[in-house]
Amino acid sequence: MIAKIKSRVDFSGIVNYANNVKEKSARIIGSNGVLLVDNSTISDSFQAQLRIPDANGKLHHLSKPVKHVSIAFSPEDVARFPDNEDGDRFMAQLAEEWLLEMGIDPANTQYVIARHFDKKHPHCHLVFNRIANDGTVISDSNEHRRNEAACRRIKQRHHLTFGNS
């Protein structure tokens, strides 16, 4: 398992990529706090959250409020992620565990997890809002160091293949 984190300015572009049914054979396998009618309503849900004021009543002005995490698993673990409900559920569980390992409460965070089938290795895309449901900002301080540790713990816990990252 390898997770690559990118910061984004705009929700609509990354939502359209993550949930690209035509080119990526994508399907949503997990979410919280977003309307899943279509990509536009997903993006609008994220955008609305940016208007939640902080504890002092001020709006946040993050230059990059969007986090996009590409979570890839080893081809050796493909049998752990069958193309069915069980495989989707397990992959979504691991993405939610990644959030927790990063110190992010999935119950207090808007996110969507989309599974892709355009590569030989199992993978998904996690898009989340840096403005939590309670109006606080989700820290991205030391996220690369925390990410490495989170992936290592999840791989150990679930006996996933270790490889070069």
Show which residues each predicted segment covers.
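N-terminal nicking endonuclease/strand-transfer module with a His-rich metal-binding environment
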Residues: 1-165
